[in-house]
Amino acid sequence: MADPQHWLITGASSGIGRLAAERLQQRGHRLTVICRSQERAEQTLGWLSGDSRVLLADLADLDQVEAIDQALLEKDEALDGLLLNAGLQYAGHRQVRWSAQGLELTIAVNHLAHQRLAMDLLPLLLRSAAPRLVITASEVHNPASGGGRVGRPAGLGDLSGLENHSAMVNGEQRFDADKA
């Protein structure tokens, strides 16, 4: 077995995040898991082992993300890996949901919170001999899931855009490299 590593994981209370966390633990690694609620934290503590720990922060509130980042930076423990897995999807909902900062909730949680974690904790990650940054998404790619049924599926269409490959935005057919 390799030397134990320290991993920070979001979205480890269920799904592929939990599976990844369980596998990392089986290999003897120490985990710091961010959970969004006390209920999720207690559930997660039920299966975490060793000196792994749970921190509370709702990724929908970037102030809470910053507080977690600052606490980890003050603790000054190197991280060998960041596994950024938490995500949500409100497919089919007519009402837009907003983060604490007034951002659309999916963007705030799935992207901005993880960007903030990665950028703020980069100094701890770079202290590792072999740092790893892993970002996952578990539903949106799957057209059979709720998240994957949003919008029209990707495709090439009728390829009519190739007929006017040099058309400018204003519709002119002439191509002028100086204006491109």
Where are the model-predicted features located?
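Rossmann-fold NAD(P)H-dependent dehydrogenase/reductase core
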Residues: 2-180
